[in-house]
Amino acid sequence: GEIVNIHASENVGYYHQAHSYVRGPWRNSVESSPMILAKCCHDMDILRYLIGEKCVSVNSYGSLSYFRKENAPEGSTQFCSDCPRSEECIYNAQKLYTRYIWPAGYFTKGELAEQNILRDLKYSPYDRCVYRCDNDVVDHQSTVLLFEKGKTAVHTMTAFSGEIYRDIKIYGTKAEIVGVMEDNFLEVRPLGGKAYRVDVNSEASVGGHCGGDYYMMLQIWNAMNGRPCEGITYLDVSLESHLMAFCAEKSRLSGGSTQFVRLREGE
C-alpha cells in the first residue's frame, strides 16, 4: 500500500537531556544549535526518505518548560555536590554519572572508574543544578510536516522519558507498521488481517547511534575507494532534512506559524 501519514517520537531520556541539553555542549542555541537540529535532523531525514516526497511546509510548537530556575527545589544549591536536596533529586549528578557511565567521558580524566568520575565531576559544569544552568534549548517540541502530495508526518521530541529510544507508527492504505528502534523488530498490522512481526538484523544495534556511526563511515570509505555505497545521498536531499529542522525552529519561535521549506529562492 501507500504511506498516508507517520507518527514518530524521539524520546531523549531524562538523563541524556540533563547531560547534553541542560548541563552539556548542546544546552545553548547560540553556542551550538537549536535542539531540533542537533537531535532530530536525522529523524527529519528518515521521514523524508520513508514518505519519498519533498517536505513543503512545517508547523512546530515547543518550549523550555521545566529546566528553569523557578522549578528548583526550595533549599537547593548551584552544585549537586553540596546540595541538601540531592538525595531526593532524580537529576543528582553523582547518581546519574555513576549509573550511566558513557556521559562521564566528557569530563573524566583517565579510566571511567567511579572514584575518577566523582573526583572530576565535583564543581564542574556537569555538577550544576539542572534548574540553574544557562540552557535555553527546548525540553519538548512537536512538529507537523506537510509533503508535496498531501502526506503528513508528526514528530515529537521530549526529554521526559525513562530511557533513550525512538518509536514510529506508519499508517498506510493497507496496513499499519509499528516499531521501536531499540527492539530490533517491526510489527505489521494489515487492515482487516492478522498482525505479524518482522525481525531486523541485530547488527544494526552495534556501536554508536545504533550502528549509524560505523555504517556512515563505511559508506564514505566505500565511496572514496570506488566501491558500491548504497547509503550515499545527493546533497540536495541531505540538506533538506536540515532545512526542515531550521524551519521547525523558526515556526516554534514564531508561535507555530507555517514555514515553507525551500532549498532555493523561488521554489
Language-model segment annotations:
Residues G1-R128, G255:
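Predominantly a Rossmann-like dinucleotide-binding segment in NAD(P)-dependent oxidoreductases
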Residues M35, Y131, A204-G208:
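Conserved short-loop catalytic and cofactor-binding motifs
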Residues K39, N135-V138:
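A generic fold-level signal
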Residues P125-N135, K149:
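Eukaryote-specific, low-hydrophobicity, charge-rich regions
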Residues V137-E267:
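C-terminal helical cap and adjacent loop that interface with cofactors, partners, or active-site loops
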